[in-house]
């Protein structure tokens, strides 16, 4: 089992959805880089569910805690360990999944892969909460790049008119269904020649990272499939 992404700058994730905590270890960060705790927490809060009717009802504070690698507001050069404690868990809701896994989730394949020793509660290590350390690591990495990153939700269920989104989401919720959407991301300040010619091209590596997010079903670059 491998849970590490990256080469020069790496992130290793750990923990399960209903365990004591989930987190990550960031390695490759140079010493002396200023760590803006308020900015990191603000980015974490953007990801935090339970703030509206269109996200999961699970409400966690998602308070970031640094265990190592930061001293007096700056990186020390050693690995940066980050955790988020779990609190709002109802493990009894997942008892039935031991016999009847959820369609489209990792319940069945995780059980097969690890001979039933996996933690199925809340999706275990396959939970969407594992994206928490990814967001934290990405926020730290931005300090190294000098690039500007922007993201915007532009479509929900094929609908681009924002005024119709709430009605569409209400109807979908009443029907007990779910729908997809499109998030548009823009990066400026990217240096020319970034990436390798073939397997490690910028698009290849970005796609690798993006498809690690459980809900991502497709990635387009530039004009996409136009």
Regions found by a protein language model. Name each.
Residues 10-15, 22-27, 80-82, 110, ...:
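Short beta-strand elements
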Residues 112-198:
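Glycine-rich, mobile lid/loop segments that gate access to catalytic sites or pores
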Residues 14-20, 175-226:
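Glycine-rich anion/phosphate-binding loop at the beta-strand->alpha-helix junction
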Residues 1-58:
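N-terminal, positively charged regions that mediate nucleic acid binding
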Residues 44-52, 84, 88-90, 112, ...:
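Structural signal for hydrophobic packing residues in well-ordered secondary-structure cores
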């Amino acid at each position: 089992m491998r849970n590490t992404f990256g080469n020069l700058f790496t992130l290793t994730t750990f923990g399960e959805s209903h365990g004591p905590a989930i987190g990550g270890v960031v390695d490759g960060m140079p010493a002396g880089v200023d760590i803006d705790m308020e900015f990191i927490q603000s980015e974490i809060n953007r990801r935090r569910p339970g703030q509206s009717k269109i996200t999961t009802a699970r409400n966690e504070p998602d308070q970031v805690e640094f265990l190592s690698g930061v001293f007096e507001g700056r990186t020390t050069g050693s690995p940066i360990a980050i955790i988020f404690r779990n609190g709002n868990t109802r493990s009894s809701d997942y008892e039935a999944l031991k016999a009847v896994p959820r369609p489209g989730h990792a319940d069945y394949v995780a059980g097969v892969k690890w001979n039933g020793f996996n933690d199925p509660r809340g999706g275990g290590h396959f939970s969407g909460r594992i994206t928490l350390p990814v967001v934290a690591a990405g926020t730290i990495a931005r300090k190294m790049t000098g690039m500007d990153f922007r993201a915007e939700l532009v479509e929900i269920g094929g609908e681009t008119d924002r005024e119709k989104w709430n009605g569409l989401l209400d109807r979908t919720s009443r029907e007990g269904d779910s729908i997809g959407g499109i998030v548009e991301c823009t990066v400026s300040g990217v240096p020319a020649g970034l990436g390798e010619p073939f397997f490690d091209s910028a698009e290849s590596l970005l796609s690798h990272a993006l498809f690690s997010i459980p809900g991502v079903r497709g990635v387009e670059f530039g004009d996409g499939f136009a």
